[in-house]
Curated annotation (Swiss-Prot):
<dbReference type="GO" id="GO:0006351">
    <property type="term" value="P:DNA-templated transcription"/>
</dbReference>
<feature type="binding site">
    <location>
        <position position="90"/>
    </location>
    <ligand>
        <name>Zn(2+)</name>
    </ligand>
</feature>
<feature type="binding site">
    <location>
        <position position="69"/>
    </location>
    <ligand>
        <name>Zn(2+)</name>
    </ligand>
</feature>
<dbReference type="Pfam" id="PF00623">
    <property type="entry name" value="RNA_pol_Rpb1_2"/>
</dbReference>
<keyword id="KW-0862">Zinc</keyword>
<keyword id="KW-0240">DNA-directed RNA polymerase</keyword>
<dbReference type="GO" id="GO:0009507">
    <property type="term" value="C:chloroplast"/>
</dbReference>
<feature type="binding site">
    <location>
        <position position="491"/>
    </location>
    <ligand>
        <name>Mg(2+)</name>
    </ligand>
</feature>
<comment type="subunit">
    <text>In plastids the minimal PEP RNA polymerase catalytic core is composed of four subunits: alpha, beta, beta', and beta''. When a (nuclear-encoded) sigma factor is associated with the core the holoenzyme is formed, which can initiate transcription.</text>
</comment>
<dbReference type="GO" id="GO:0000287">
    <property type="term" value="F:magnesium ion binding"/>
</dbReference>
<keyword id="KW-0934">Plastid</keyword>
<dbReference type="GO" id="GO:0003899">
    <property type="term" value="F:DNA-directed RNA polymerase activity"/>
</dbReference>
<feature type="binding site">
    <location>
        <position position="493"/>
    </location>
    <ligand>
        <name>Mg(2+)</name>
    </ligand>
</feature>
<keyword id="KW-0150">Chloroplast</keyword>
<keyword id="KW-0479">Metal-binding</keyword>
<keyword id="KW-0460">Magnesium</keyword>
<comment type="function">
    <text>DNA-dependent RNA polymerase catalyzes the transcription of DNA into RNA using the four ribonucleoside triphosphates as substrates.</text>
</comment>
Amino acid sequence: MIDRYKHQQLRIGSVSPQQISAWAKKILPNGEIVGEVTKPYTFHYKTNKPEKDGLFCERIFGPIKSGICACGNYRVIGDEKEDPKFCEQCGVEFVDSRVRRYQMGYIKLACPVTHVWYLKRLPSYIANLLDKPLRELEGLVYCDFSFARPIAKKPTFLRLRGSFEYEIQSWKYSIPLFFTTQGFDTFRNREISTGAGAIREQLADLDLRIITAYSLVEWKELGEEGPTGNEWEDRKIGRRKDFLVRRMELAKHFIRTNVEPEWMVLCLLPVLPPELRPIIQIDGGKLMSSDINELYRRVIYRNNTLTDLLTTSRSTPGESVMCQEKLVQEAVDTLLDNGIRGQPMRDGHNKVYKSFSDVIEGKEGRFRETLLGKRVDYSGRSVIVVGPSLSLHRCGLPREIAIELFQTFVIRGLIRQHLASNIGVAKSKIREREPIVWEILQKVIQGHPVLLNRAPTLHRLGIQAFQPILVEGCAICLHPLVRKGFNADFDGDQMAVHVPLSLEAQAEARLLMFSHMNLLSPAIGDPISVPTQDMLMGLYVLTIGNRRGICANRYNPRNRRNYQNERIDDNNYRYTKEKEPYFCSSYDALGAYRQKRINLDSPLWLRWRLDQRVIASREVPIEVQYESLGTYHEIYGHYLIVRSVKKEILCIYIRTTVGHISFYREIEEAIQGFCRACSYGT
């Protein structure tokens, strides 16, 4: 449907019998009205043509081949000169065969049938509106018992009988005789109501505004009473208040959407278009049919049997009619939702039939797989991995995926730079992966964002924009801070990448969807780009260091081996294999790590600026080492102080690791960047 703003939308809800009839009925040019499916047949076993008034009837749903009727005659579609527009012999219109994808039919039910979604799904809408237990309504719907009291607002035999203050002795003999007379059928239809018809009458008598008002009054009265002191009674009152709130919300929803409650009971059953429940011929001449066709056949068989019983009601016992009504109700329940009442219906191979609910719901349903999960151009999919060196707004795009996504842009670049004379030559260069192709691709992606999406997209942050960079391999690299917004894990999750083509889409991606502009949760406002499991584990490994203390290094058995220590002299640092190295700056330490001279967790001594907290420390040195020139080293647990002969502090070294240095530098750069941003803002 299209709303007043010309937005296409799909809404699922209850519709009136008149609307179902308008969807399915159509008037042929000769004035004949078709649309009702009355026969449970599909194709004739000899001619392989659809049966008339069956589940694949061409009069109801349109021709199988465009412009060809059931008789084999052909007419040009859309030619106004061709007259008539339908075959007078078979009644099939000369229209496009695609009409069989949306033309519906209907089954006129011999008795009202409740929609199982509104009765059995929790919460039960019918039970909430009628304010009755679900078990009682189920017994009424499936004809397990009847209402032995008047349903309609009119004087009845049972109502008059209950108004007398005394019993007439003769009634003990007259009433049993009355039940055995021929007029009992009239009495039964008037005084006793059962099945979905009784539910429909009760729903039709409801006034939704009165229900809302009475429920609100009762809710206020329960709220004014206060706690009773009895835990069981308080819980009962709480459940009643919750029920009243749900009932008011449901009644308001019906009023707001102009839906009548009695529409939850079906009188006309829609029949899906044939192309949505096809019968396909496979190798060997065998036919494969949708399970919905078999469920429709079951409904039509039982409905036709009930119709025959009702036409011969004088000679048919009432119990037989009620039993057949129950079978019709169960058949419709199985069609709509197989297994909702317990044991699902199975075929001859013990395979469960797929009902209408099974077709549309779930990951492989019609909506998520076919309508929402369509394959689109300029998109790809791959596994995500951590990209720790990436900026927050960047993502690593594999080269092979990027060359496919941006192939048209690369072709345009090759032609504009006169590196290819036409599209064919440009595609040939791309297939051969010439070096110039990667240069042009690098220029293209610099100004073109991409969208990353992880299904299911449950909120706005499920799809975000990134600036791509080319990476090797086949996996998409992602900054770990954006993981929480996607609700993704780096354990094999896949994400889809899309290329926004129009200028409007690219502007929206840059202004609204970039990851560094979505740092807060749109739902509660809390920070969503926070360190999570992967980053915390990485920081732990980065800063864990070597657990051995400074004392343990002196008595390490490895130090007792007799071999000459290799000493490496440099202007920036002094390093020996057996002793912990000394560095003058963090850049020297990181350079030694890149040259693989030290490990990430290897302890080292780093020259540090004077710190008053260190000088004022009352810690007793573990060891004091004197040199020949009179200077000496005071060695503490995590730092050492070099003093002169006059006990002046010459320099300070702290005991740390390369991991700690890297972590400290990242924090320092972040603080400096924040301070610069604040200074620019002021």
